[in-house]
Amino acid sequence: MVIDPVTLSQELISFPSITPTDNGAISFLSDILSQYGFTCHILDFGDDTVTVRNLYAYRGTEEGPNLCFAGHTDVVKTGDLTKWKFDPFSGHIEDDILYGRGAVDMKSAICAFIAAVSRINFNEVPGSISFLISGDEEGDHFQYGTPSVLKWLNENNHKIDYCIIGEPTSKSFLGDTIKVGRRGSVHFKIICNGIQGHVAYPHFAENPIDNMVSILYKICNTTFDTGNEYFQPSNCEIVSVDTGNTSKNVIPDTIVAHINIRYNNIHTAESLFDIINNICAQVTPKYQLLQSVSGEPFFNQPNQYSDMLSSAIKKVTGQDAIASTSGGVSDSRFIKNVCPVIEFGLKNETAHKIDEHVPVKEIYQLADIYTEFIKQFFNLSTT
């Protein structure tokens, strides 16, 4: 029996799986996939404060290649419910548009791939198809999602040969963009120290704000690079600056700034640390610099599989897709250490927004694209 991807999307959206809470979404998918012959493993990882529920499901033979679809069932918070046209967890359809939290990012893509798989004759598949579904990609406990599942796969001798992630990569229209890599993301915490004092007696104090202003000015006027063929120039943004001082007549003794750099493969987090550290040292010796790396940049050279995906998109939509490395980090930063990975999904315009929505036509088209890609991947009949 072939699955309707829109109906399935409505059902999956109805689970309020706000990260890292699952609320039954993973078990629902496990039940569906089990009905279609998949061996399903529900995997719980976490610590004393949180448990993240994940799913790994597979079907086929171990003798051929494994094509994995990766995604996440967790969604971001809804925001002000009174601003939504419809209940964000109702899966409401109005004027052929599906509304709901996760409609774009990325429950509909999961359902589209499941629908695609339901159309495949597994007797003809010379390999296997799998699903790696994380319960926390959006939140702070992502380490208990995809990274933990990948570790489990390795420990239990499960292989993945190629992975497609259903992140919403499209911009203006479905199929205009596929992601063949991602920029890196590094966060810096800069602390400048001074001497607290009365604003009327600055000679008895040392204002750390002066040094921080100089440091941030130098950072903002630094050209880290000019980009390359596949990546845009690295970009730095000041996220916050704070002294924690609520008094109007006191010079603070400390100021803290947070900056984020999205960087290309010309740099590493280590090389950027050296640049920022050097700038701070030029201004003052009274500083501390702390670094947190969300992911290093990576790039997958175009290959036969990305060509297959482009061909599938062209066949269904008539459009030519471009390969891109723009946007934020995703779970591809973990999966790329295991196998080649590509990302393709719906338009991202309303992701994380009030009234997140997608035309139902595009969900059907996405399922058609995924179906065509699977057939080309395994060299199945495309008639």
Swiss-Prot record:
Pathway: Amino-acid biosynthesis; L-lysine biosynthesis via DAP pathway; LL-2,6-diaminopimelate from (S)-tetrahydrodipicolinate (succinylase route): step 3/3. It holds the Pfam family M20_dimer. It comes from the Bacteria. Its EC number is 3.5.1.18. InterPro entries: ArgE/DapE_CS (IPR001261), Bact_exopeptidase_dim_dom (IPR036264), DapE_proteobac (IPR005941), Peptidase_M20 (IPR002933), Peptidase_M20_dimer (IPR011650), Peptidase_M20A (IPR050072). Zn(2+) 2 binds at D105, E138, H352. The active site is at D74, E137. It catalyses: N-succinyl-(2S,6S)-2,6-diaminopimelate + H2O = (2S,6S)-2,6-diaminopimelate + succinate. One of its GO terms (molecular function) is zinc ion binding. PROSITE patterns: ARGE_DAPE_CPG2_2. Zn(2+) 1 binds at H72, D105, E167. Binds 2 Zn(2+) or Co(2+) ions per subunit. Its cofactor is Zn(2+); Co(2+). GO terms for biological process: diaminopimelate biosynthetic process; L-arginine biosynthetic process; lysine biosynthetic process via diaminopimelate. Keywords: Amino-acid biosynthesis, Cobalt, Diaminopimelate biosynthesis, Hydrolase, Lysine biosynthesis, Metal-binding, Zinc. Catalyzes the hydrolysis of N-succinyl-L,L-diaminopimelic acid (SDAP), forming succinate and LL-2,6-diaminopimelate (DAP), an intermediate involved in the bacterial biosynthesis of lysine and meso-diaminopimelic acid, an essential component of bacterial cell walls. Homodimer. Belongs to the peptidase M20A family. DapE subfamily. This is Succinyl-diaminopimelate desuccinylase. It comes from Ehrlichia ruminantium (strain Welgevonden). The gene is dapE.
